[in-house]
């Protein structure tokens, strides 16, 4: 007999910033509660959805369930003990959590999502009692309570761009003589893309604390075949700086209102689907809508080089070549999705071709304290994640998907689902490489990215947040901060990497690509010393060492990893000696030389000398470029390109990839 599990799910969004003083290692999680078979119990169902339970049937019984539900018009399953329990709780329906769609059914069955059913019954019946009755049936593997996905965006209010900068303010944050890559007028305020250390923008600030995307744009700016599903508030698909990069379901756009024109199980899903309201229309004007999803979307793929607004990391070059944003709406004003609807949302994103699931939401720090507890309490969600990651999409350069989560904003342990190993957990950095005051951190953290830091800066404090697209109410462009804002930087870089892979005709496995993302970083440890003072206290930065993830995401390194080009990071103004012969494995008797174009020399301020097979390189400017290592052995000439990246500080091993 399969052991039964009965769990309660209560989801809380973690966007409020925690601003207290330092505590003793808040990332050390307490021991998880005893969930062994002998002591497992039903947790409180006080906040769960009344009259509803989620049931996962065994592999052996699912065929009978499917046949029974079809015959009985969704009121009985054909499994006598289960049907008897349904009668006792006055069940009114038994339906599959995800829709039955012929073209995607094989994938649903491969992941096991087809075995999850939603049971609805008289809401006057005790949830706990109903759960016990259903769990007692031998053909049931799991009974899980459903619950609404709560949110709290009140601490994340957008600060309109025009409240920070007057419309006639001179451009700043641009080196003398430099021409921006694109003509978007607010790009120079997006320090998180290119940070020149200009203290007229905000202070404190350090040059190079950015995602290094400008040199990456020389190779790739995006690709419309790459789809990023933004699981959040609705994305304002009419926004002037987003409309051209919105994913569009052409069958529904050109179809009949109220009809599922493409037969995918969802009606009128033109730009995605509104799972909060269970409708095709994506909304953003309800009371309590904050523009959160629209801000996240802009960081990933605001349209580049269109002469307005801001830039997106993978927003293209102004030639309809940016990655596409699919709006997976799970919050709409006072409406929230349930955990089962979220599973449906993830299934939808998978089926409709999204390769990246962008998730700036999750549980509060400490709500779940271990992977075991997470799997016990939210197994249906973990099942949906596995489905997204492992399902192949036709024509995609990624043979599956990647899921990217915000770590949370309580200045404590990384929250779940972000801390779950199969997803990427993103922490937040300020303008000077220090952890944001609010960021969660700890061993589950995978990678760091700019997320801003409202309570830290001395002048123009709002400009130390992340600038992106928002709703008309906030002037279309505004600043926000949080791990909600750092997370889409990683999603954007991942999307840029997949775009470049598409351009080069390369494909990657999900684990392989995830490893490439996590390796495409700059070291943070040199900055994690001493004490950081902020408006509400101090932070001992040593406590964050090894707990912010692998490092700060670097878009240029990501593209070099996709390209297959080795990259080395050199420290600004510090001579660095590299062995040129190492690029040719065990070949001996080599004669090597280094070839550098004038353009790369100028961009990096690069000078070098070669002695034997060793080159000593010095760079005076923070940027990146390709050089060529040439060699000969016998009468054969060989060449190999190498990427040189100059940053303010570098890891002791030179940052080899």
Where are these regions (language model features)?
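Acidic-leg catalytic submotif of subtilisin-like serine proteases
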Residues: 138-141, 206-279, 295-299, 303, ...
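Hydrolase catalytic cores
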Residues: 297-300, 326-332, 355, 359, ...
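C-terminal subdomain of the subtilisin-like protease fold in secreted/lumenal serine endopeptidases
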Residues: 354-361, 400-401, 501-591, 655-657
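Bacterial Sec-dependent N-terminal signal peptides
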Residues: 17-43, 647-657
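Flexible, small-residue-rich helix->loop connector segments that border functional cores
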Residues: 216, 231-238, 251-264, 285-290, ...
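Protease zymogen maturation seam
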Residues: 103-118, 132-227, 235-241, 245, ...
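Inhibitory N-terminal propeptides of secreted protease zymogens
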Residues: 29-167
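Substrate-binding/access-modulating region of protease and related hydrolase catalytic domains
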Residues: 23-26, 218, 222-224, 233, ...
């Amino acid at each position: 007999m399969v052991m039964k599990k009965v769990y309660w799910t209560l989801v809380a969004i973690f966007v409020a910033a925690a601003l207290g003083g330092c505590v003793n290692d808040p990332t050390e999680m307490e021991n998880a509660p005893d969930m062994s078979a002998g002591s497992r119990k039903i947790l409180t169902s006080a906040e769960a959805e009344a009259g509803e339970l989620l049931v996962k049937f065994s592999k052996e019984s699912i065929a009978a369930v499917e046949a029974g539900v079809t015959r009985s018009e969704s009121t009985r399953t054909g499994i006598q003990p289960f049907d008897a329990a349904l009668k006792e709780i006055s069940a009114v329906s038994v339906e599959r959590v995800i829709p039955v769609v012929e073209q995607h059914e094989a994938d649903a069955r491969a992941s096991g999502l087809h075995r999850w059913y939603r049971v609805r019954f008289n809401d006057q019946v005790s949830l706990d009692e109903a759960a016990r009755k259903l769990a007692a049936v031998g053909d049931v593997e799991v009974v899980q309570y459903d619950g609404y996905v709560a949110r709290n965006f009140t601490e994340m209010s957008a600060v309109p761009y025009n409240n920070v900068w007057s419309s006639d303010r001179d451009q700043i944050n641009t080196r003398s003589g430099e021409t921006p890559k694109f003509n978007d007028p607010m790009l120079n305020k997006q320090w998180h893309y290119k940070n020149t250390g200009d203290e007229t923008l905000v202070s404190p600030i350090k040059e190079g604390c950015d995602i290094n995307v400008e040199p990456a744009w020389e190779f790739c700016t995006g690709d419309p075949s790459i789809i990023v599903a933004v699981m959040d508030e609705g994305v304002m698909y009419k926004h002037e700086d987003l409309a051209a990069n919105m994913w569009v379901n052409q069958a529904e756009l050109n179809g009949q209102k109220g009809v599922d024109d493409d037969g995918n199980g969802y009606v009128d899903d033109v730009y995605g689907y509104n799972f909060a309201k269970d409708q095709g229309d994506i909304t953003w004007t309800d009371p309590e809508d904050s523009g959160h999803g629209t801000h996240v979307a802009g960081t990933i793929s605001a349209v580049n080089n269109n002469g307005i607004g801001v830039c997106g990391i993978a927003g293209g070059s102004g030639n309809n070549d940016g990655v596409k944003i699919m709006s997976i709406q799970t919050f709409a004003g006072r409406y929230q999705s349930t955990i089962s609807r979220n599973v449906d949302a993830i299934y939808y994103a998978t089926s409709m071709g999204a390769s990246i699931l962008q998730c700036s939401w999750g549980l509060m720090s400490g709500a779940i304290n271990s992977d075991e507890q997470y799997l016990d309490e939210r197994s249906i969600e973990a099942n949906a994640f596995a489905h997204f990651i492992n399902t192949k999409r036709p024509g995609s350069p990624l043979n599956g998907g990647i899921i990217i989560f915000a770590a949370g904003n309580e200045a404590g342990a990384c929250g779940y689902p972000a801390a779950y190993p199969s997803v990427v957990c993103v922490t937040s950095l300020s303008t000077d490489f220090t952890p944001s005051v609010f960021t969660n951190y700890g061993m589950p953290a995978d990678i760091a990215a700019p997320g801003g830091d409202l309570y830290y800066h001395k002048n123009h404090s709002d400009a130390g947040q992340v600038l992106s697209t928002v709703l008309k109410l906030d002037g279309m462009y505004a600043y926000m901060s949080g791990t909600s804002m750092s997370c889409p930087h990683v999603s954007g870089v991942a999307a840029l990497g997949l775009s470049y892979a598409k351009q080069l005709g390369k494909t990657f496995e999900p684990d392989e690509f995830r490893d490439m993302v996590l390796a495409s970083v700059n070291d943070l440890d040199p900055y994690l010393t001493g004490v950081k003072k902020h408006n509400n206290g101090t932070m001992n930065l040593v406590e964050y060492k090894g707990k912010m993830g692998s490092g700060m995401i670097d878009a240029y390194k990501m593209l070099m990893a996709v390209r297959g080009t080795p990259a080395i990071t050199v420290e600004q103004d510090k001579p660095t000696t590299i062995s040129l012969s190492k690029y040719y494995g065990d070949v001996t008797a080599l004669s090597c030389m280094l070839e550098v174009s004038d353009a790369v020399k100028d961009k990096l301020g690069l000078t070098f000398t070669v002695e034997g097979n060793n080159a000593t390189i010095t760079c005076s400017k923070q940027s990146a470029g390709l050089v060529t290592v040439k060699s000969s052995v016998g009468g054969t000439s060989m060449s190999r390109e190498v990427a040189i990246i100059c940053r303010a500080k570098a890891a002791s091993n030179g940052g080899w990839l």
